[in-house]
C-alpha cells in the first residue's frame, strides 16, 4: 500500500513539474504580452487626457462605446498573462483561469453582438466586426485553448496565445482609431445641439 501511495504522489509531482515546464516555456511571451498591454493602456489614457479639452458631441457615450472595449481588451491580455505566470499551477487551475477569462470576454463581447439592450448604437458593420465579432472569436480561442490545455498543454497554450495576440492587435487598431479621432476633432469644437 505505501508503495502505491508513493507512486501516486510521485506521478502527481512529475505531472506538476511537466506542467510548470510547459508554462515556463511561455514565460517570456506572457511577460511581453503583459508589458505591451500595460504600456498601451497607459498611452491610451494619455491620449484621452490630452483630448479631454476637445468637446465632442455625445463624448461620454462615445467613450463608453469605443474606449471602454479597447481598455477591456488590453486589460484582458494583461490579466490573463499575469494569471498564467502564477507559480504552482495545476492543469486544472491553469485551465480554469484561462477558461474564466475567456467566458467573461465572451459575455462582454457578446453584449455588443446583441446590441447592448437597445441603447444608442454608434456601430456600423465594420465597428461591429472590430468590437464584437473578432473579440468574440479571440475569447473563444481562450476558452477552447483552456479546455485543450487540460489535455494537451502546448496546443492549448498556442490557442491562448493566438487569442491574446488577436486581442492585443485589435486593441492597438482601436487605439489608433481613437487617437486619429481625437486629433482630427478641432480644438474647442462645441456641441451644435
Predicted regions, residues:
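Juxtamembrane transmembrane-helix termini
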Residues: 48-58, 86, 90, 114-119, ...
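Helix-coil boundary and interhelical linker segments in multi-pass alpha-helical membrane proteins
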Residues: 15-33, 82-95, 146-160
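Core segments of alpha-helical transmembrane spans in multipass integral membrane proteins
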Residues: 39-43, 67-82, 98-110
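Membrane-proximal helix-loop-helix units in multi-pass membrane proteins
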Residues: 83-142
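Juxtamembrane helix-loop boundaries in multi-pass membrane proteins
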Residues: 25-35, 55-79, 120-139, 180-193
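N-terminal signal-anchor/start-transfer transmembrane helix
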Residues: 35-52
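Terminal transmembrane helical module of multi-pass membrane proteins
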Residues: 142-192
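N-terminal amphipathic/basic-hydrophobic helices that include classical n-h-c signal peptides
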Residues: 1-18
Amino acid at each position: 500500500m505505501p508503495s502505491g501511495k508513493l507512486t501516486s504522489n510521485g506521478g502527481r509531482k512529475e505531472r506538476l513539474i511537466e506542467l510548470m515546464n510547459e508554462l515556463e516555456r511561455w514565460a517570456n511571451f506572457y511577460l511581453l504580452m503583459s508589458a505591451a498591454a500595460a504600456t498601451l493602456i497607459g498611452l491610451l489614457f494619455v491620449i484621452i487626457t490630452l483630448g479631454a479639452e476637445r468637446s465632442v458631441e455625445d463624448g461620454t457615450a462615445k467613450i463608453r462605446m469605443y474606449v471602454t472595449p479597447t481598455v477591456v481588451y488590453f486589460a484582458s491580455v494583461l490579466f490573463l498573462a499575469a494569471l498564467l505566470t502564477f507559480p504552482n499551477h495545476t492543469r486544472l487551475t491553469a485551465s480554469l483561469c484561462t477558461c474564466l477569462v475567456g467566458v467573461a470576454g465572451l459575455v462582454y463581447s457578446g453584449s455588443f453582438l446583441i446590441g447592448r439592450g437597445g441603447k444608442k448604437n454608434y456601430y456600423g458593420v465594420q465597428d461591429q466586426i472590430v468590437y464584437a465579432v473578432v473579440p468574440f472569436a479571440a475569447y473563444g480561442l481562450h476558452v477552447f485553448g483552456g479546455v485543450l490545455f487540460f489535455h494537451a498543454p502546448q496546443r492549448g497554450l498556442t490557442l491562448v496565445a493566438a487569442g491574446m495576440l488577436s486581442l492585443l492587435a485589435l486593441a492597438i487598431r482601436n487605439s489608433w482609431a481613437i487617437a486619429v479621432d481625437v486629433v482630427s476633432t478641432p480644438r474647442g469644437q462645441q456641441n451644435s445641439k
